[in-house]
């Protein structure tokens, strides 16, 4: 039996995990797995805990929570020999879904800790201005384990599920603020998305994909750099994508009206949005940049958007513009199910 370190977020699933954690402990105990539990106490704490386990003798470092908890634990052990396990207990759980871990099945997820399949996935190094403080939400801290930024004041994080900005990051900000906390799963993200769309105010930006020429865009719509097919609790944002390849996938849909954004939610859930209105595209991508425009309308790396354009990494608001994203292969060892979706 493996010896595992469990890093659990008691606030996951709007606090339900903390109230029901005894059920997970009972299931772990009955499975014969030797385990230790480390409870997180706030944003970033799972990175600290996980980074301290890089040289430990645990067979697995297990994230118990949602995609945000997975994001932090993965940042803490990325680049080491440690392997990530997951017991999904969040609202989205899209990374667990992407590596074949069953959702809403605690025993099924625990069984995979012992008898699952091992994989290695890529990661996206993201560097940008750290997001400012928000009422009740501190500005993200720098952790040495994620690597040094190229510019003072910047933040570095690694993403393993998705990176997004604009309207979709407004969704994550409202989630952090506790909107619709009585709703869980995909339905929660649907309500949040409707509210975010109706309150969104247009912003312009400059973007550059790989070696293509940079150009200006109206951010009314979406952009997402994806390493899995879904986020937001199952929305098929990048149909056919999986985290085992040699690049990410970028989904761009700019200049959409609010009516179009509302009408695309149904197709987005089913993965039928690409090509719609001639405005939504999906392509492979290894690097991406986004910057604000200066008063003369030129891209600038000296300052960000005003108001800030938030960038979410794996569902966690971390940065504001200017931001650079770079895909790197072979960054994280994971344990998942025998048949992850879309893996050939």
What would you call each of these model-derived segments?
Residues 69-82:
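Short Gly/Thr/Asp-enriched flexible loops that form oxyanion-binding sites at enzyme active sites
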